[in-house]
Amino acid sequence: MRLILLGPPGAGKGTQAAFLTQHYGIPQISTGNMLRAAVKAGTPLGLEAKKVMDAGGLVSDDLIIGLVRDRLTQPDCANGYLFDGFPRTIPQADALKSAGIALDYVVEIEVPESDIIERMSGRRVHPASGRSYHVRFNPPKAEGVDDVTGEPLVQRDDDREETVRHRLNVYQNQTRPLVDYYSSWAQSDAAAAPKYRKISGVGSVDEIKSRLSQALQS
């Protein structure tokens, strides 16, 4: 099973990716982790990437694709792989296609923007323990304080509504076009085209898991 999960921040991709990697026995390919591993291992591409990053530059798509190709030759990719946070842009998707990297499915997890804002801006954490709550879906026993210590809960900067809205705007402008890219390719009936599936990301984790399983069998 070789696939890409698409969807806005807060759509639950991380939770579903964990289920899929376990279910199919495939690794989650994250370009961030891959870059760090290549730099640490001192591979030729890793050293090249380190040079760029040390100079404060952005690693080129060509270099990323080279790292992806290297990563996919490793034994744990024999049964497939799941791309996490990649590709993010049309040029990256084009580069992936040109490199002949096979895909079986591209799955879009769709969640209305208002739901995402509520999900993310309602999160609260207890910094010392990492315990997390949600003002609506998983509230503490007493408002604004940790159940165990009674210490105040905080809202992380990442979860503030203005930050969430900014991240959603970046997604709409940069990554959302991939939805059209992959759905058009899937409809073209080209030999290498992946199947494109869209599922609703609204509901319980198990409900979404079930929708995802059905989508990957159709």
UniProtKB/Swiss-Prot annotation:
Enzyme class of the recorded protein, top EC level: transferase
Residues that coordinate or bind AMP: 31, 36, 57-59, 85-88, 92, 156, 167
Renumbered residue ranges of the record's region LID: 122-159
GO biological process: AMP salvage
EC number: 2.7.4.3
Molecular-function GO term, any one: ATP binding
GO CC terms: cytoplasm
Region (NMP): 30-59
Keywords of this entry: ATP-binding, Cytoplasm, Kinase, Nucleotide biosynthesis, Nucleotide-binding, Transferase
InterPro entries the record matches: Adenyl_kin_sub (IPR006259), Adenylat/UMP-CMP_kin (IPR000850), Adenylat_kinase_CS (IPR033690), Adenylate_kinase_lid-dom (IPR007862), P-loop_NTPase (IPR027417)
Entry's localization field: Cytoplasm
Family affiliation: Belongs to the adenylate kinase family.
Assembly with partners or alone: Monomer.
Name of the molecule in the record: Adenylate kinase
